[in-house]
């Protein structure tokens, strides 16, 4: 009799086998017998599926890396890369455990990266595990930690991750930026914690310090806005014999926030917003001129809320008076009177300060300010002192023993700093107070006497005087405009009808004539609609650019007023710096910092010079212009619309850092103001937005349009005014749009970019820039992004970019543009500031 198979028994055995396999190999671990290969597309996922580890190749690169990214977030965001400086050259790569180490092998079975653990029992089995906080661990069979990725950060600090020093081993955990947004290899920027008596963070470019966080004051790093206390974020700073580290913890579930050093050197706090499905920038550093390291030199401090930005501490004077007058405070300040160190020295208190660089400090956390002051007076090297901890009214003592530098004053926040002064400087203060009291009594008597005399004179008046007031619509002469700007030899400038004084040095006409070789043609740098720009050299050797306004231009005087009023208020690394002005003998001149590499258009559209603009330089220029425009629109004290952004108005310094210039057509907007209307359209055709050129409506989105045109010009090396098809009906915008629609947009890229990159051609990065440029030049203003969004898109390859709509002014040439082409000026200089348009739709 034939037996019947026991299907139930077979199924039971099969089920047991499946369960055994499921539990024996966890998806968040890698055992000694397992491996990850690129070809298998296998990854390791953390228990709650927050993070994922695996191989990736950025954009269209052929290089492969082992990395960790957010799995729970739809936008691919990398937080750690293992072999960032040793990528796999092909898709044949393997991660496995070899001995006590994690090792990546290439196609020839050669190791390209390893955890490099030495010693230990190689016979003890080890396993790797990915945790929900993003940490990748290697443990032995006794659960002893052998290695963790948190000790080797790349460009991102996650929650529970430590940044700083392990004092026992001397190992320093630092953040280092990607080289570019598409290249994970080590970039030039780093963020690291320097150990001193009073530790603080630096952002460095190679070995040069760019930014200093200020020391930990018990609650936060004194100049880092991101350490403001919020209920869901807990910050921790530890300074002990074992470690000097900074970390943070998130108390709210399903909240993802990271500290990120981008490829442009900005340290950003980014938080994921589920509602918008995007990373939002909560803060970044460095942000303004005063964040730049030691911008005001020794014994000088910076104040971004006033002008000039650099000031000497009371009792000090500038080392270089002329450079100081020209707003270059880097030489710093020196004492007016030397310290006596005989017990008679005293202190001046500076409020709301970022404490100075702490490289040379002595810290005692057990004493208060009174004893701290006494110790400072006992030490002839002591230059200043302050509380070490601001909590509970302040405690502890920190003493500076060398020149103090890199200070700034805040409108809110900061802490008190006590700077040592000679007794003579303190005596001057006492004498001044006595003089003030005596003068007040004398002035009161004088005012009373003056009132009596004035009253008597008024009664003697026999006739009234009629003052003729000119019509406000009359064109004012150039001489009358001198009264609009009050400039004294002490360097104070005020706007008409306002009591606001702006520090602006006044230079003599004779001095400028000497500096420019009597305005020689050999010194001529360029010519615009309002005058000529000359190169000059002052007696101290400082090079300057002198903009001499044309006497024949009625609008040149308006431009002069506008430029003085606006640029004097602006301080940013990507904006040209106004050093002074000249109002003398009917002449009006503006004095700027001299920028060695002249304007962007002189490089971009010149066949010889353009060869020096490889893609990395062009990308840096794009980012710099975007940062400058973002500052104008969002971060400056007054919102400013430039209205004439173009290649010839972007200047380049010796390091090819771009600086936006020419603010003669700019307008100030209120914080709640979104757009304005004008009957006098000014700007340059080819860069003007449709709504501005046709209807006189301008806004921040008008500048965004100009930026988009400029971005596409930088990528293509072509002017927007040319025609780029056989029918001569497509300008640059139409040319790029057609190639975008056809899917062959890389054909618009300047061949120099391709030649300079060879095998490292960052296709994905360039495509992103083209797409961002098209977003900026969309026909409808409401469709264009704001500059803060542009910066995020430029700085992160993981940010989703919308599909662009049709650009404005992409086909043909307008009649007005045709008319303007008859000018004898070059196309890029042919502005429409001499044209007045009638706008029917008044708003």
UniProtKB/Swiss-Prot annotation:
SMART domains: B_lectin, PAN_AP, S_TKc
Glycosylation sites: 41, 92, 116, 236, 251, 381
Topological domain ranges for the Cytoplasmic compartment: 457-843
EC number(s) given by UniProt: 2.7.11.1
Pfam families per the UniProt record, alphabetical: B_lectin, DUF3403, DUF3660, PAN_2, PK_Tyr_Ser-Thr, S_locus_glycop
Disulfide bonds: 290-302, 296-310, 372-397, 376-382
Ranges that cross the membrane: 436-456
Binding site for ATP: 525-533, 547
Topology feature Extracellular, residues: 32-435
Domain Protein kinase: start-end pairs: 519-809
Leader sequence residues: 1-31
PTM note: Autophosphorylated on serine and threonine residues.
Location in or out of the cell: Cell membrane
Catalytic residues of the enzyme: 644 (proton acceptor)
Region of interest called CaM-binding, as start-end residue ranges on this chain: 608-625
PROSITE patterns reported in the protein's UniProt record: BULB_LECTIN, PAN, PROTEIN_KINASE_ATP, PROTEIN_KINASE_DOM, PROTEIN_KINASE_ST
Tissue expression profile of the protein: Mostly expressed in leaves, and, to a lower extent, in stems and flower buds.
GO CC term, one of those recorded: nucleus
All residue ranges annotated as the EGF-like domain in the record: 286-322
Residue list for modification Phosphothreonine: 678
Subunit and interaction comment: Interacts with PUB9, PUB13, PUB14 and PUB38.
Task performed by this protein: Involved in the regulation of cellular expansion and differentiation. Mediates subcellular relocalization of PUB9 from nucleus to plasma membrane in a protein-phosphorylation-dependent manner. May be involved in the abscisic acid-mediated signaling pathway, at least during germination.
Protein name, as recorded: Receptor-like serine/threonine-protein kinase SD1-7
Provenance organism: Arabidopsis thaliana (Mouse-ear cress)
Source organism phylogeny: Eukaryota, Viridiplantae, Streptophyta, Embryophyta, Tracheophyta
